[in-house]
UniProtKB/Swiss-Prot annotation:
Keywords: Disulfide bond, Glycoprotein, Protease inhibitor, Repeat, Secreted, Serine protease inhibitor, Signal. Residues 1-20 form the signal peptide. The lineage of its organism: Eukaryota, Metazoa, Chordata, Craniata, Vertebrata. Transmembrane segments: none annotated. It is found in: Secreted. It comes from the Eukaryota. The record marks 37-38, 128-129 as: Reactive bond for trypsin. Residues 27-77, 118-168 form the BPTI/Kunitz inhibitor domain. It comes from Austrelaps labialis (Pygmy copperhead). This is Putative Kunitz-type serine protease inhibitor.
């Protein structure tokens, strides 16, 4: 009996070790680009090759096998890290928080600019682009990811998670986020695009009407030149009336 118990214990331990070493279920999800047309470089775990591979993510409707960095993919799926890595949101305006070890420091709310850069609510904006951005959630005191439409946002909108944390949970000076080579190119202002479209829609019909009227004018001029009697009628004067009456009198 003792031998059988030892054997059963070894089998149980082996099964537990195998389960611990196997990647989480999210790592077995297939590659999903998504229907949106953005172009973000992301990483996924390939269960066949057992390696983390880079792919292009469209920006929405992805799955959990979607990591911001190769290190996140490696720690989660290959090393089997306990902490979940940052996941790209699966739909527009979906919040994703990145867990941090330990307690977050208290936000220094009395600092100049804190209300603009950290306490302002998340603003997606009316435009329909799909840019991954970060904002500081005052209630949870965490930096969260969201999808930014591309225009009419506010200052609680960061390109990088690290800058969000340093701005809103540190004790340094709050400043504008510096530009970076990997940042998205600035979009043209929405009023300008709408005004240009309105001008084109207003001018184009006027041009078409002008061309049509000009063509009709040329057409009628050509007809009048071919048939002069249509344009210049016979002039009837009083002398013609007298001659007509005299000829009738002689006839009688």
């Amino acid at each position: 009996m003792t031998r059988e118990k030892s054997l059963a214990l070894l089998i149980t331990l082996a099964a537990a070790l195998a389960a611990a070493e196997s990647p989480p279920g999210r790592c077995h999800s297939p590659k999903t680009v998504g229907p949106c047309r953005a172009s973000f470089h992301r990483w996924r775990y390939n269960a066949t090759s057992q390696m983390c591979q880079e792919f292009i993510f469209g920006g929405c409707k992805g799955n959990a096998n979607n990591f911001v960095s190769k290190q996140d993919c490696f720690q989660t799926c290959i090393r089997g890290g306990a902490a979940e890595a940052t996941v790209v949101p699966s739909g527009p305006a979906t919040e994703v928080a990145t867990p941090r070890a330990g307690h977050l420091p208290e936000a220094y709310e009395n600092r100049p600019g804190f209300r603009e850069f950290c306490a302002a609510p998340r603003v997606v904006g009316p435009c329909r682009a799909s840019f991954l951005r970060w904002y500081f959630d005052l209630e949870s005191r965490m930096c969260k990811m969201f999808i930014y439409g591309g225009c009419r946002g506010n200052k609680n909108n960061y390109l990088f998670e690290e800058h969000c944390w340093s701005q809103c949970t540190g004790d340094g000076e709050i400043t504008e986020e510096p530009g970076d080579a990997g940042a998205q190119p600035p979009l043209p202002s929405e009023p300008f695009s709408f005004s240009t479209r309105a001008v084109v829609l207003a001018v184009l019909p006027a041009i078409l009407v002008t061309i049509l009227l000009g063509s009709m004018g040329v057409f009628f001029v050509k007809i009048c030149r071919k048939n002069p009697e249509l344009s210049v009628g016979t002039v009837w004067s009083t002398l013609d009336d007298k001659e007509y009456l005299m000829s009738n009198a002689y006839t009688l």
